[in-house]
UniProtKB/Swiss-Prot annotation:
Listed GO CC annotations: oligosaccharyltransferase complex
Protein name in UniProt: Dolichyl-diphosphooligosaccharide--protein glycosyltransferase subunit 1
UniProt keywords, alphabetically: Endoplasmic reticulum, Glycoprotein, Membrane, Signal, Transmembrane, Transmembrane helix
Chief localisation class: endoplasmic reticulum
Stored PANTHER family: DOLICHYL-DIPHOSPHOOLIGOSACCHARIDE--PROTEIN GLYCOSYLTRANSFERASE SUBUNIT 1 (PTHR21049:SF0), RIBOPHORIN I (PTHR21049)
Cytoplasmic topological domain residue ranges: 447-460
Induction and repression of expression: Upon infection by L.pneumophila.
Quaternary structure (record): Component of the oligosaccharyltransferase (OST) complex.
Similarity comment: family membership: Belongs to the OST1 family.
Phylogenetic lineage: Eukaryota, Amoebozoa, Evosea, Eumycetozoa, Dictyostelia
Pathway: Protein modification; protein glycosylation
The keyword Ligase belongs to this UniProt entry's keyword annotation: no
Bilayer topology: Single-pass type I membrane protein
Organism this protein belongs to: Dictyostelium discoideum
């Protein structure tokens, strides 16, 4: 009996601590008004949230936002001046509310009590929210998608007023949930306005509609930059692509596809990637070899690199390939004249619209001898280092490895890698080549002066 009482006391204390965490969080801000605009015209849910919040405490510099723990999201936060704010998973996220992940948005300045803050949060998600329903279709059939969300803005704070608009891919809506007031006009579903919503209020949203967009997912993406102070910046990207839309059931007819390719809009027939205007020496290969069905088109501010796989990717199909090109090093690498430190500015991600990446790895191969390596990025990441030996290397080149889970095309942003490199390290490889050539010349000269014959020929 005593053991049971102790157990009940322990459970009560856990509940009390959890309640205190929620209460302390909800008493720091109040949402005066929230406007949510959700775009589900593709396979991604792109949510733009405008928040007007009032601080309830003094010296407040952390605003929190929560999401269903089942959803994998990519978050970007901006202040009223469009300055990007730091977003990271709250250290005590699991203790705030069960079933939710809570993220901290770090404000630029501390906020006084009763001061109003306006934020804009962009959220991109796909996993668990966009479900092909039915999960299997025949060639030529229309793909239907079930979209799941919350009628209310999921927040650890109370919300005075809020409204949500959902833009669909089609006006063909099979069904949709209703939390009055609710209206459907054409391709837009409007929920609200709602008033006096408590923290972590949940009302399941469910919209079943026609969406022919292919579920373009990169299960693994490896992008590699190789820096050469004597050459260029080589870029190579490895893709593991999968169409996670409604799976194709039955046989695939190439004849029907060639006759009318638009019948199956949920297929992936080509991939268009935006690359810098200065890119040259393009190549595109898969496990079989070079693929000639690729092209590039010069536009005003970029090159459109068009990649056409050997076959269209229907629902449930996968493909792997890699591409590459070269960039002039002087446009991406600069040196601080005061400190001698090198600054490399490159993009994280790939310039492909409406792409979702489950596992994203970026590698930066620096010159041999690089030291004091640091990475600066506007988002959280995990970092590790490798060593790679290639031509003319002695100790190997340092490789910076950056890894992020669940990213979207919105993560196509610049990161900076800084490092130091001595003059000896810069001239290391040219000196090796010069030394090798000089040694070879000396050897040839000495060899030509030695007489290695067994007997000297007699002169007549």
């Amino acid at each position: 009996m005593k053991v049971l009482n102790n157990l009940l006391l322990f459970v009560f204390l856990i509940f009390l601590v959890g309640s205190n965490v929620v209460n302390s969080t909800s008493q720091t801000w109040i949402n005066q008004d929230v406007q949510r605009s959700i775009d589900v015209t593709t396979h991604l849910s792109k949510e733009s949230i405008s928040i007007k919040a009032k601080s309830l405490t003094d010296k407040n510099d952390i605003y929190q936002i929560s999401f269903n723990s089942k959803y994998h999201v990519s978050i970007q936060a901006l202040d009223s001046q469009n300055n990007e704010l730091k977003v990271y998973l709250s250290p005590n996220s699991i203790n705030i509310k069960e079933g939710f992940k809570t993220y901290n948005i770090e404000l630029k300045n501390k906020v006084k009590k009763d001061e109003i803050v306006q934020l804009k949060v962009k959220v991109t998600s796909m996993i668990e929210q966009m479900i092909p329903y039915p999960s299997e279709i025949k060639q030529g059939q229309t793909q239907l998608v079930l979209y799941l969300n919350n009628h209310y803005f999921t927040s650890p704070y109370k919300t005075e007023t809020q409204k949500t608009t959902v833009k669909l891919a089609s006006s063909k809506v099979e069904s949709y949930s209703e939390e009055q007031p609710t209206s459907l006009k054409g391709m837009t579903v409007t929920y609200g306005p709602y008033s006096a919503i408590e923290a972590f209020s949940v009302s399941p949203m469910r919209i079943h509609y026609e969406n022919g967009s292919p579920f373009f997912v990169l299960t693994n993406l490896l992008k590699e930059y190789e820096v050469s102070h004597w050459g260029n910046l080589a870029v190579e990207t490895h893709y593991q692509l999968e169409n996670k839309g409604a799976h194709l059931v039955g046989a695939f007819s190439r004849l029907d596809y060639q006759r009318n390719p638009s019948v199956n809009p949920n297929q992936i027939a080509e991939v268009n990637e935006a690359v810098p205007l200065s890119a040259t020496d393009f190549y595109y290969r898969d496990s079989i070899g070079n693929i000639s069905t690729s092209s590039y088109q010069y536009l005003a501010n970029r090159i459109n690199f068009k990649i056409q796989p050997r076959f269209p990717l229907m629902g449930g199909w996968k493909n792997t390939f890699y591409t590459g090109y070269n960039l002039p090093i002087e446009k991406f690498l600069s040196v601080d004249t005061l400190t001698g430190q090198y600054h490399l500015n490159v993009t994280f991600g790939v310039g492909i619209d409406n792409v979702y990446v489950e596992n994203h790895i970026l590698k930066v191969v620096l010159p041999e001898g690089a030291t004091d390596i640091k990475v600066h990025a506007p988002f959280a990441f995990t970092q590790s280092e490798e060593n790679r030996k290639t031509y003319l290397d002695t100790i190997g080149r340092p490789v910076v490895v950056i890894n992020i889970k669940d990213t979207a095309s919105e993560n196509y942003r610049y990161i900076q890698v800084t490092y130091n490199l001595s003059s000896l390290s810069i001239f290391h490889e040219p000196l090796l080549v010069i030394g090798a050539v000089f040694t070879l010349c000396i050897f040839i000269i000495l060899y030509s002066r030695f007489d290695l014959s067994i007997s000297k020929s007699k002169q007549i």
